[in-house]
């Protein structure tokens, strides 16, 4: 692939890691953020200490606070901003974009209030005149591992397979590999909902439960993610792939996962506001729990784990009691998809 110009919007841990992958592939990478000190640090010291204490970035990665400069004459734009500000940033991009680009996002969440997936937000806010079909970049990927060039396999999903193939080539190298998929609904739903299950898995650990319980919540969590995804129009096979079970494993079993760590702290009795303050990073699973619970209620989809986490976070229920209550739920077949 010839050298591309790419704007990466969001200099968080994942945005920074993806910027480095793209830079390793010989592309011109422009990293955009709105914290002046952070942008100056990246440009001057080639570090992003808030997220990576011991990593030096390539000096060719340039950071910007001016969005217009960052997206000027680029071939593609990658959104890696928190879910809650995706629409705001998309509106800003729409007002500045003067040419057609390949539009990608690598965030995982559902918009509070509207319940919309992030690709839908981008479609609504940025005219088709100036973008490709949205490409979703998602899968089992800790930024802490990708940044040190550990082997990572994820998915590029788009309704337009050619756009997905473009992104596949854009990112893939000897340590980072993408597979294509056309099931955007499934890939985005899996990526968002696995954060809820990761909170639950972390809570089990914090409560002192063992591997049996953790395996149970991950497996049954996958079942309810699939149930809701299918109701939303997803292909059930997607949930057995990288963006489904793969992402669920990596997020639901690792201390690298901020959602798992948040659940662990909840299980140990810490208050949510203290957890969010101490972590200093967005915990997407918290807001996604509320959105997923509301969608499940509207569609009458059975999601007992999501409901238990919701009641613990938003209704003040005891996390241990909420989890144990699931053990007395009505008996069901393992393969019920409704």
UniProtKB/Swiss-Prot annotation:
Keywords: Cytoplasm, Lipid biosynthesis, Lipid metabolism, NAD, NADP, Nucleotide-binding, Oxidoreductase, Phospholipid biosynthesis, Phospholipid metabolism. HAMAP family: NAD_Glyc3P_dehydrog (MF_00394). Sn-glycerol 3-phosphate binds at residues 108, 139, 141, 194, 247, 257-259. The gene is gpsA. SUPFAM superfamilies: 6-phosphogluconate dehydrogenase C-terminal domain-like, NAD(P)-binding Rossmann-fold domains. Its EC number is 1.1.1.94. It catalyses: sn-glycerol 3-phosphate + NAD(+) = dihydroxyacetone phosphate + NADH + H(+); sn-glycerol 3-phosphate + NADP(+) = dihydroxyacetone phosphate + NADPH + H(+). InterPro entries: 6-PGluconate_DH-like_C_sf, 6PGD_dom2, G3P_DH_NAD-dep, G3P_DH_NAD-dep_C, G3P_DH_NAD-dep_N, NAD(P)-bd_dom_sf. Pathway: Membrane lipid metabolism; glycerophospholipid metabolism. Catalyzes the reduction of the glycolytic intermediate dihydroxyacetone phosphate (DHAP) to sn-glycerol 3-phosphate (G3P), the key precursor for phospholipid synthesis. It comes from the Bacteria. NADPH binds at residues 13-14, 108, 143, 258, 282, 284. This is Glycerol-3-phosphate dehydrogenase [NAD(P)+]. One of its GO terms (biological process) is glycerol-3-phosphate biosynthetic process. Pfam families: NAD_Gly3P_dh_C, NAD_Gly3P_dh_N. GO terms for cellular component: cytosol. Belongs to the NAD-dependent glycerol-3-phosphate dehydrogenase family. It is an enzyme of class 1 (oxidoreductase).
